[in-house]
From Swiss-Prot:
Role played: One of two assembly initiator proteins, it binds directly to the 5'-end of the 23S rRNA, where it nucleates assembly of the 50S subunit. One of the proteins that surrounds the polypeptide exit tunnel on the outside of the subunit.
Gene: rplX
One Pfam family hit: ribosomal_L24
Name of protein: Large ribosomal subunit protein uL24
Entries under CDD domains matching the protein: KOW_RPL26
SMART domains: KOW
Native source species: Nitrosospira multiformis (strain ATCC 25196 / NCIMB 11849 / C 71)
Subunit and partners: Part of the 50S ribosomal subunit.
């Protein structure tokens, strides 16, 4: 079971975007994730008349290491670690380490 999943609210804990919050858009194996609004790059795109692209400078989100992000805990309003807890009827579920609240309710 993966600790970080698509749709999780995360906070960057290291790197040039330290302190920024965003939502996970994509999880790329083995240890990269794309977070909305974090690690933005400018790409110079060539026009393509077949697809209808006008070209120009396009800003896009680029992948960031999983080790540089932590899940955001709304109860404590801080970055938190993820643990696993066994729940009857559901099996293993993710939880916050600080207050043992379930993430996937």
């Amino acid at each position: 079971m993966s600790k970080i999943k698509k749709g999780d609210d995360v906070i960057v804990i290291a790197g040039k975007d330290k302190g920024k919050r965003g939502t996970v858009l994509r999880v790329m194996k083995p240890d990269l994730v794309v977070v909305e609004g974090v690690n933005r790059l400018k790409k110079h795109q060539r026009p393509n008349p077949n697809k209808g692209d006008t070209g120009g400078i396009v800003e896009m989100d680029s992948p960031i290491q999983v080790s540089n992000i932590a899940i955001y805990n709304p109860a404590t309003r801080k970055a938190d670690r993820i643990g696993f807890k066994t729940v009857e009827g559901k099996g293993k579920a993710r939880c916050f380490r600080s207050n043992e609240e379930l993430i996937d309710a």
